[in-house]
């Protein structure tokens, strides 16, 4: 039986990032260092209200991008202004953990982001109070797994990096920087 290969970013985290964060934040225990817990990729598909095939196509594309089958997200409550009824399918999402999470992050940072037109980095102000980082992408075309000829419409997505054990936004920001996340330079 063949032993599965450890993802490159996981090796980097264990061998380089953890010791560096321990030194930077004066942490004695390596288990108290900020760690990437999961990545949630969400595609909101408002047009699915009129045509369910659009949601099916979005689910197929999200599955190809992440390598995992997406789940359908339904409306929690009715919103009359948007013509949404409770329980209607309006989005699809994937939660990535362990090896698949690191593989996806590697492809996102090193393959997909450089393909974004006029890319100057991701904004630094998208951290919440818990240290989680949310990134919005306008198109799914930047991923090499998506065939340009087969897409019917450009579909955006939100990618949330859930970070455990970060005591502040700065610790979470430092972790993502060490992973290679291309943040915009702050104007001071």
Where are these regions (language model features)?
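Ribosome-associated RNA-binding proteins
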Residues: 1-188
């Amino acid at each position: 039986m063949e032993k599965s290969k450890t993802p490159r970013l996981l090796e980097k985290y264990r061998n380089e990032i953890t010791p560096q964060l321990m030194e930077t934040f004066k942490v004695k225990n390596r288990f108290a260092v900020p760690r990437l817990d999961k990545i949630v990729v969400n595609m909101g598909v408002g047009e699915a209200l009129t045509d369910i095939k659009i949601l099916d196509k979005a689910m197929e594309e999200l599955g190809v991008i992440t390598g995992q089958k997406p789940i359908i997200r339904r409306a929690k409550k009715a919103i009359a202004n948007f013509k949404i009824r409770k329980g209607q399918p309006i989005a699809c999402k994937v939660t990535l953990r362990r090896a698949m999470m690191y593989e996806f992050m590697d492809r996102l940072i090193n393959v997909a982001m450089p393909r974004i037109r006029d890319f100057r980095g991701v904004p630094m102000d998208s951290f919440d109070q818990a240290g989680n980082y949310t990134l919005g992408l306008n198109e799914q075309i930047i991923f090499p797994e998506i065939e340009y000829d087969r897409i019917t419409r450009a579909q955006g997505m939100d990618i949330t990096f859930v970070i455990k054990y970060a005591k502040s936004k700065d610790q979470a920001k430092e972790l993502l920087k060490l992973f290679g996340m291309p943040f915009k330079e702050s104007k001071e």
